[in-house]
Amino acid sequence: YITCLFRGARCRVYSGRSCCFGYYCRRDFPGSIFGTCSRRNF
């Protein structure tokens, strides 16, 4: 089963384990592959 990550969860930008719908992996800093799940701004 696929679990998604909620806001504030640690994530990797290029990983299959992604943030929940409506969220995205915001990089810690430009060029980083690590980040934190944050709400998308539509």
Curated annotation (Swiss-Prot):
Subcellular location(s) per record: Secreted
UniProt key word ATP-binding: no
One of the record's GO cellular component terms: extracellular region
Keyword Secreted: yes
Main location: secreted
The entry's keywords: Antibiotic, Antimicrobial, Disulfide bond, Fungicide, Knottin, Secreted
Tissue specificity as recorded in UniProt: Granular hemocytes, small secretory granules.
Disulfide bonds: C4-C20, C11-C25, C19-C37
Coiled-coil region: none
UniProt-listed InterPro entries: Tachystatin_B
Example GO BP: defense response to bacterium
Domain writeup: The presence of a 'disulfide through disulfide knot' structurally defines this protein as a knottin.
Role according to the record: Exhibits stronger antimicrobial activity against the Gram-positive bacteria (S.aureus (IC(50) is 7.4 ug/ml)) and fungi (C.albicans (IC(50) is 3.0 ug/ml) and P.pastoris (IC(50) is 0.1 ug/ml)) than Gram-negative bacteria (E.coli no inhibition at 100 ug/ml). Binds to chitin (4.3 uM are required to obtain 50% of binding). Does not cause hemolysis on sheep erythrocytes. Has no blocking activity on the P-type calcium channel.
Name used for this protein in its record: Tachystatin-B2
Species the sequence originates in: Tachypleus tridentatus
Biological classification of the source: Eukaryota, Metazoa, Ecdysozoa, Arthropoda, Chelicerata
